[in-house]
C-alpha cells in the first residue's frame, strides 16, 4: 500500500491519480478536504490525519510500504506555518514511517533547498532532506525547479486577466529550467519501488533553461498577441501574492540549469516543452 500525503494539492493529486491508474492500492492522508473527494471516488482510501499530530500519522502509515509526500504549508492557513508543517510536520512523518518499517519514503523537496538557506521554506526543506537521509529508510528526494503551470499562470496569467503589463524582476535575463508539473509526476511514479531511485536526490528540470523575458516572448507567440513587460528592481513590489516575492526575486539572483539526460535515461520520462504548457494555460481567444 502507498500513502500519499498532500493529495489535495496539484502535484499530490496528480501523483495519486497516476498511482490509481496503475492499479496501485493508495491511501491518502486527509483533513476532510473536499478536494480529495474525486480521488476517493476514483478508489483512494482516505485516512484522517495531520502532519502536526504524530498519533494520527502512526495510524496512517500502518501497513504502508511506500510513503509519498508533497505536502507543504505554502497554501495552508490557520495554525499551519512553514515551521509546523515543513519542518516539524515532516519530521513527524519520517519518524512514523521509520517506526512502521516503511520500505521507501519519497519526499518532494525543491531544487534550491538548502539547510543553510536564509529562506525558511528552503531551509526547512533542506533540513528535512538531512533528516530523511539519517532515517535508515530507503529514501528518494524529488527536487523539482520552478513549476511552469504555477508560475507562468501567476506571473503572466494574472497580468492577462487584469489587462496589465507582465511584471518581471531585474532584467529578467537569468536562465532557469522551468518544469511541468506532469513531468515531476512521471518521475515520482517511476521512482516507486525502483532501486535506481533509492537513497538519492533527483533534481528535476524542464527540457531547456530559459529566462523570464524569453518565457514572456514565447508565450506571446503561442497566444498570438504582444505582451508588454514592466521591469522592477529586486525588492520592488510585485502584483503576485507577497509570500511568493522572495522566489521571484531569487530567480534573478542565480541561474539554474538542470541537466536531465541521466534522469531521462534512468526513469524513461519525457519532458514537456514550454509551448505545450503555454497552450494549455493560455488558449487563444
Where are these regions (language model features)?
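Structural motif
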Residues: 1, 65-66, 104, 249-255
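N-terminal Rossmann-like NAD(P) cofactor-binding module of classical short-chain dehydrogenase/reductase
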Residues: 61, 65-68, 86, 106
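Short, conserved SAM-binding segment of the class I
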Residues: 89-92, 96
Amino acid at each position: 500500500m502507498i500513502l500519499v500525503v498532500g493529495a489535495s494539492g496539484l502535484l499530490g493529486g496528480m501523483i495519486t491519480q497516476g498511482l490509481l491508474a496503475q492499479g496501485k492500492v493508495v491511501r491518502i492522508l486527509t483533513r476532510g478536504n473536499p478536494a480529495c473527494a474525486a480521488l476517493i471516488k476514483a478508489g483512494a482510501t482516505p485516512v484522517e490525519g495531520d502532519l502536526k499530530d504524530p498519533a494520527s500519522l502512526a495510524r496512517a502509515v500502518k501497513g504502508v510500504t511506500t510513503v509519498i509526500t508533497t505536502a507543504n504549508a505554502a497554501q495552508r492557513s490557520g495554525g499551519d506555518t512553514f515551521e509546523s508543517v515543513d519542518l516539524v510536520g515532516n519530521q513527524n512523518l519520517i519518524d512514523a514511517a521509520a517506526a512502521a518499517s516503511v520500505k521507501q519514503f519519497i519526499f518532494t523537496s525543491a531544487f534550491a533547498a538548502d539547510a543553510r538557506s536564509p529562506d525558511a521554506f528552503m531551509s526547512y526543506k533542506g533540513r528535512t532532506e538531512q533528516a530523511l537521509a539519517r532515517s535508515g529508510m530507503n529514501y528518494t528526494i524529488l527536487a523539482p525547479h520552478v513549476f511552469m503551470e504555477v508560475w507562468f499562470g501567476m506571473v503572466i496569467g494574472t497580468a492577462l486577466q487584469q489587462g496589465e503589463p507582465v511584471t518581471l524582476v531585474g532584467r529578467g535575463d537569468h536562465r532557469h529550467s522551468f518544469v511541468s508539473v506532469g513531468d515531476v509526476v512521471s518521475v515520482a511514479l517511476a521512482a516507486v519501488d525502483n532501486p535506481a531511485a533509492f537513497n538519492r536526490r533527483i533534481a528535476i528540470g524542464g527540457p531547456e533553461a530559459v529566462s523570464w523575458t524569453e518565457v514572456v516572448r514565447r508565450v506571446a507567440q503561442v497566444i498570438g498577441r504582444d505582451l508588454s513587460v514592466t521591469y522592477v528592481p529586486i525588492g520592488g513590489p510585485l502584483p503576485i501574492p507577497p509570500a511568493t516575492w522572495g522566489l521571484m526575486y531569487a530567480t534573478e539572483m542565480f541561474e539554474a540549469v538542470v541537466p536531465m539526460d541521466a534522469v531521462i535515461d534512468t526513469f524513461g520520462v519525457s519532458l514537456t516543452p514550454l509551448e505545450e504548457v503555454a497552450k494549455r494555460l493560455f488558449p487563444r481567444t
